[in-house]
Amino acid sequence: MAGRISAFLKNAWAKEPVLVVSFSVWGLAIIMPMISPYTKYASMINKATPYNYPVPVRDDGNMPDVPSHPQDPLGPSLDWLKNL
């Protein structure tokens, strides 16, 4: 089986090297995101980054879910990124 595949690849490379290279690049483009550590860390950063940022509001003391200052740390932190 491996002999047939290698013979096919040698023949294809001899006749159409552009197609062989293009299919190889396509295969790497499909496989690399699954095995890349960049994908793992990018998804961790996206989970920790808020989608909506706090709007400055006048706090009357009855809003426990609104931070007193927009830069107050709330939610998941990115300390793991600093410790890489």
From Swiss-Prot:
Which keywords accompany this UniProt record?
Answer: Acetylation, Electron transport, Membrane, Mitochondrion, Mitochondrion inner membrane, Respiratory chain, Transmembrane, Transmembrane helix, Transport
Principal place of residence: mitochondrion
Q: At which residues is N-acetylalanine found?
A: A2
Q: Name one Pfam family in it.
A: NADHdh_A3
Family per similarity comment? Belongs to the complex I NDUFA3 subunit family.
The entry describes its oligomerization and partners as: Complex I is composed of 45 different subunits.
Q: How does it sit in the membrane?
A: Single-pass membrane protein
**What domain of life?**
Eukaryota
GO aspect biological process, one term? proton motive force-driven mitochondrial ATP synthesis
> What sections of the protein cross the membrane?
19-39
Task: Report the CDD domains cross-referenced here.
Answer: NDUFA3
State its location(s).
Answer: Mitochondrion inner membrane
Q: What is the protein named?
A: NADH dehydrogenase [ubiquinone] 1 alpha subcomplex subunit 3
Q: What InterPro entries does this protein's entry cite?
A: NDUFA3 (IPR026626)
**What job does this protein perform?**
Accessory subunit of the mitochondrial membrane respiratory chain NADH dehydrogenase (Complex I), that is believed not to be involved in catalysis. Complex I functions in the transfer of electrons from NADH to the respiratory chain. The immediate electron acceptor for the enzyme is believed to be ubiquinone.
- Region listing for Disordered, in residue ranges: 59-84
**Listed GO CC annotations:** mitochondrial inner membrane; mitochondrion; respiratory chain complex I
